[in-house]
Amino acid sequence: MYKKQLIIIFLFLFFISYAQTEFITLWKPNVNGTIDNSITFGGTGTSYTISWEEVGYPQHSGLMNSVTSNSSSPITISFGTSLNTNPLQATYKLKVSNGSGLFYGFRASPDYINPNANLELTEISQWGDIIWLQQFNTAFAGCPNLNVTASDTPNLTQINNLSQMFFNCSSLAGNNSFSNWNTSTITNMNGMFSRAKLFNQNIGTWNTANVTDFSGMFSFAAAFNQNISGWNTAAGTNFSVMFKDAVAFNQPLNSWNTKNATNLRYVFSNAAAFNQPLNNWNTSKVTSFEYMFENAVSFNQPIGNWDVSKVSSFAGFNMFNGALLFDQDISTWNIKLQNFAGNSMSFGFKNSGLSCTNYSNFLIALNNNPAWANSTITSGNIDATGLVYSTPQAIMARAQLVNKGFTIIGDSYNSGCFLSTVETSKKITTPAYPNPTTGVITVESTENENVYVYDITGKIIKNMTLNKGKNSIDLTGYPSGNYLLKGNHIFTKIIKK
């Protein structure tokens, strides 16, 4: 009898240890102001089980057995009449398990492009031991009220696509469990945290060895600023838009292996804080850098050693518009003019920080490019708004480029700016305080100077003359963000709180 009891206890403990843990979520069905107390549930599986209860009122509960559904055609779950005295705040906990069948997929809404596609889903509190077989691309996209509080992690071993998984999840803050995710099978992280403006979890240990598509992964993720320098990016081909409008991001990336990268379009566009070295990046296969540093107002790192020999798209070098501080020599770039089958090409330096010396050297190098002999280019555009050129060689180079069909706009000639040492000595970081500021900032100038204040888009919002000594600039009526005060000889970055 005693042995029999031991066996029963052992079997009980054995099954308990292997007991299934559910996928648990929280929902507010009436959050949109209409009291219908029902939700659409985009689960995928056969003969699975859903149990639910009203949070705070456990006596109000229900059980659904043998559920078979597909996330492309969500089922409706009706909770009846809420016991909450304020039905608009009624919250329901759903627990989903395999039951007698298999639950293996979820999508919050088929209309994932809509930023408010699913207002009702508010929390993932447990991933459970569900083995996800349906790809997680767009799984929670369009859930602006969703946060993940689960301390466990999803089992991703049978899928490879996390693209746009949390797209437009504007309330997603997450927790430190994200650092434990096993992403070793994932190949696509396109837009995974795009527009998840609160997300800033440490995911630097993720296994990204198989990821080929990083495009848009942190675009518009305004808070994200974690060190991901240890990621294995050797398989990556598409990095376009990866940090576009990730305004806080400023972490080292120079150790990344980009040997297979072909698309670097918009990678740091509007990434206002980013200013990290990238000189170790292998760009030998890149076909387009279009708008890569557009309005990257802090970026000023040497990239003159980049291999740009594969660039072939018309706007492939239209990459520095609004890069207010960028002032590096790119005259050594091996631009292959014969790659441009469309007979035209463009360069973008509008309102960039390119000095007279570096802009002059660029004009000379482009005009003297030995590939002209094999090129079919008959036209081109150079937006050089705000730039200055000098030296007889630069004057001649510019004129010859115009004769070759180039339209060059916005630049001007200044005979007195041809010595880089003179430029460097005149370019002074102007004392400005308090910085950050809530409105009025005091700027000290060593001379009288015409200056401009640029916003993050490169737009001039103020122009004025600084007098020698202390000057006041009022930004009270302008939104919070990064601004740049810039003249011919001085510049300073201003942060408006």
What are these regions (language model features)?
Residues 14, 154-157, 434-436, 445:
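Proline-rich low-complexity regions
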Residues 5, 26, 428-432:
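A generic hydrophobic-helix recognition signal that picks specific residues
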Residues 424-497:
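C-terminal outer-membrane/trafficking sorting elements
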Residues 20-418:
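Negatively charged
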Residues 13-15, 402, 426:
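Short, structurally constrained coil/turn elements
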Residues 1-22, 421, 484-487:
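Bacterial Sec-dependent N-terminal signal peptides
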Residues 5, 394-395, 435:
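Alpha-helix initiation and N-capping motif
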Residues 4-5, 226, 233, 239, ...:
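N-terminal cationic leader/targeting segments used for protein routing and processing
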